[in-house]
Amino acid sequence: MSVKEAVAERFQEICAERNIKPNELANRAGVTPSSVYSMLDPRRKEVSVNLVKKLCDGLDMTLGEFFSTPKFDELEQEIQ
C-alpha cells in the first residue's frame, strides 16, 4: 500500500466513523470539495501534507492522532 492510499483510506475510515461526507469534510477544513475527492481518488498518486493538515484540522484531530495507527507502520518504502 502506498502512503497516499493509506492516507485516503484513513480519512475514509474516520469519516465513516463520524458519518461525515466528503463535502462536509471539505467545508469543515476550508478546502474545495474537489480537493477532498481528488485525495480520495485512487488514480491520484500523491497528497500534500498541507491538505492532510487542513483535513485533520477540520476533523479536530492532530496529525499525530491521524497517523497513530498500525496502517502507517506497515507501509512499504516508495522509491521513485
Predicted regions, residues:
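A short, Lys/Arg-rich alpha-helix, primarily the initiator
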Residues: 1-21
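Phosphate-coordinating loops and pocket residues in cytosolic domains that bind phosphorylated ligands
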Residues: 8, 41, 68
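Residues in the recognition helix of alpha-helical DNA-binding motifs
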Residues: 14, 28, 39, 69
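The alpha-helix within a helix-turn-helix
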Residues: 15, 26, 56
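Short alpha-helical DNA-recognition segment
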Residues: 19-38
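Short, charged recognition helix plus adjacent turn
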Residues: 38, 67-80
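Short, basic-rich loop-to-helix N-cap that marks the start of a DNA-contacting helix
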Residues: 43-54
